[in-house]
């Protein structure tokens, strides 16, 4: 069980670090194209900017429309996150992870369910 956890973490952490680094590189390149430095205030050379962006995202206030259905308004993004994590669990990482013969069909089926999350988000705002 511990080996499976470490194997999964060893797969997910480098992917997340690569996404953070590529986002930083993209922002730096866009800054240089606009004749400015890009993110450079957070940490040396702006290397901690993705961490600051993630922290800022976590502390943002959630705004709910006044006439929105609260249950559907909050459960739709949770459904989307659940489906995304479920899709990640199908990817074979080691010997003891999920490995189906019909995993492509399962991926297509689960990804088609994300439409209901978007539909619920729009419907819950009553607009």
UniProtKB/Swiss-Prot annotation:
Family, similarity comment: Belongs to the complex I subunit 1 family.
Subcellular location as annotated: Mitochondrion inner membrane
Chief place where the protein resides: mitochondrion
GO molecular function: NADH dehydrogenase (ubiquinone) activity
Keyword rRNA-binding annotated: no
Recorded catalytic activity of this chain's protein: a ubiquinone + NADH + 5 H(+)(in) = a ubiquinol + NAD(+) + 4 H(+)(out)
Annotated InterPro entries: NADH_UbQ_OxRdtase_su1/FPO, NADH_UbQ_OxRdtase_su1_CS
EC number(s) stated in the UniProt entry for this protein: 7.1.1.2
Keyword terms, alphabetized: Electron transport, Membrane, Mitochondrion, Mitochondrion inner membrane, NAD, Respiratory chain, Translocase, Transmembrane, Transmembrane helix, Transport, Ubiquinone
Function field: Core subunit of the mitochondrial membrane respiratory chain NADH dehydrogenase (Complex I) that is believed to belong to the minimal assembly required for catalysis. Complex I functions in the transfer of electrons from NADH to the respiratory chain. The immediate electron acceptor for the enzyme is believed to be ubiquinone.
Residue stretches spanning the membrane: 2-22, 71-91, 100-120
Protein name listed in UniProt: NADH-ubiquinone oxidoreductase chain 1
Species of provenance: Asterias forbesi
GO biological process: aerobic respiration
Membrane disposition: Multi-pass membrane protein
Class in the EC hierarchy, top level: translocase
Cross-referenced PANTHER family: NADH DEHYDROGENASE SUBUNIT 1, NADH-UBIQUINONE OXIDOREDUCTASE CHAIN 1
GO-annotated cellular components: mitochondrial inner membrane
